[in-house]
Amino acid sequence: MFLAETELITGGVSMYPTLETIRQLAQTKEYRRIPLCRELYADRYTPVEVMRILRKASRHCYLLESASQTEVWGRYSFLGYEPSMEITCTDRTLKIRTTDAEGKTEETVRQVTHPGDTLREIIRKYKTPVMEKMPPFTGGLVGYFSYDYIKYSEPKLKLEDREQQDFRDMDLMLFDQVIVFDHFRQKVLLITGVRADDLEASYEEAVKKLEEMAQLIRNGEHMEFEPLRLQSEIQPKFPKEKYAEMVEKAKHYIREGDIFQVVLSNPMRAKATGSLFDTYRVLRASNPSPYMFYFSSDDIELAGASPETLAKLENGTLSTFPLAGTRPRGKTREEDKELEEGLLKDEKELAEHNMLVDLGRNDIGKISKIGTVKVEKYLCVERFSHVMHLGSTVTGIIRDDKDAVDAVDAILPAGTLSGAPKFRACQIIEELEQSKRGIYGGAIGYLDFAGNLDTCIAIRLVYKKNGEICIRSGAGIVADSVPEKEFQECCNKARAVVQAIEQAQEGLE
């Protein structure tokens, strides 16, 4: 890790690292890009306000935030706009759209066996050092991998080309500029990259870019988001009776020994107009979660608050955090405690959780050094606004020949969204659900230019596409599952998002 000394340039502007430090890093020939950061005081701004400005400036933008289970706000909020590249892949057709400084776009299309090779090339091209004073994300690829991305890591798994509103298997945008709220230091950090191959000229360009970003935040026009309006009732695709039939079929496969557990989901849809941004505002206030996100792009708008990490790779340590076993929150502290005790004694929930911890160990073990896979935390009750879950932590040290793309391949989709054994569970999901899952059960987050990864499981979210919103939730089916209870579990998991939509419709101050 490199020390990012601060230097003051014209007007007392705080900027780091120094030009001399950047020169030294460039001379190592190890890095292609060195992050440059400028600080502003944050007391005049909020992430929501800045997001309004960025959305007015660019249709392609994002906001990533976090809060712990104790509802303590996370240290950083990350925002980005005007990506210089978008990489999408659908049924092995890879598209790369680049945008230059003048706004001119160019698109290339090619067929690929696996999009991961292209992602590795891009990350190598922008290889960036980890800087001591910098936040964990200073630029990289931000977006989603859909549930159906599994077709690239498991080519023998046959997924039908069914409707799911033409969802892409992968949609990642390259952001060289990042705006970071450091809530602990009460600073806004503006970050862009300096190219090592043209250092002096690139440094001057970066300083100018940071000034443009500062002016945009200070003086930019705010987006007036159109309020969300439902044009029809939110309805589940599978009514209780149909979902019960699916559960019984899944239990048949369990009795036959095909699987131990499978997660069956139920999408809820409605026609809608307007934006999901106010829905995100409600979620971040009413359902603070480790992963809160808002995305806007050409074809989709997305808002959510996920409790569960899919995969996190930081300085060589790979982690996953399976959540399995659910109870609703109690209305009183006493009722909440009773529900917790019942959860910890429920043999069905404990068996399901143990299976998924084992699956997490297996997934991480695929690409970790022998003897490094550990269960760091086991059977802890994690509380959220509407539900509580049993949670564990599994870690491993990634092998030298593996990387962040391999981590996505190894773990996506999570066992908590598929089942065990995973391959056969995915086949049964394909048979019983009769539709592509799209983003549900996939991954949302970033792969950075330093080789790190932080992604959540795509749950507790709503997306809007082609004039329709969709919320999807699932339940883990085991041998003694009661169909009606599993249907209700789907409803419980969707409740926080449905209530956020209803509140957003009523209007926010």
PLM feature spans:
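Short, Lys/Arg-enriched N-terminal segments with co-localized hydrophobic residues
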Residues: M1-S14
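Extended alpha-helical targeting/anchoring segments
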Residues: G11-E509
